């Protein structure tokens, strides 16, 4: 007799979600951003990075032609990518993404993240 635990139920739900989502996210930056956030919240950093990078790829053309909502999606994707890179310890990549996010959608969160990453890089350089 097999007994499903809550772990098994969550695993089955996650697998069903992952099987259903790829078809829904085709060329839809907002859905890739949402999926990246979902992965990041669950600690699936590599998967989150792939989704945030896909948003960037989908908007790889002339960003000056983007609508306001698209600017926000792209800026958020770069910010989240910077956060994901910090979780991997990839500080230079994180700094580049945070700066890119600030260029697209300047705000306090981006500015603060850039400052924190700069401090971390300086501490690492001083410790070596």
What are these regions, as identified by a protein language model?
Residues 24-39:
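Bacterial Sec signal peptide processing site at the extreme N-terminus
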Residues 58-71, 107:
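Flexible helix-coil transition and linker loops at the boundaries of alpha-helical arrays
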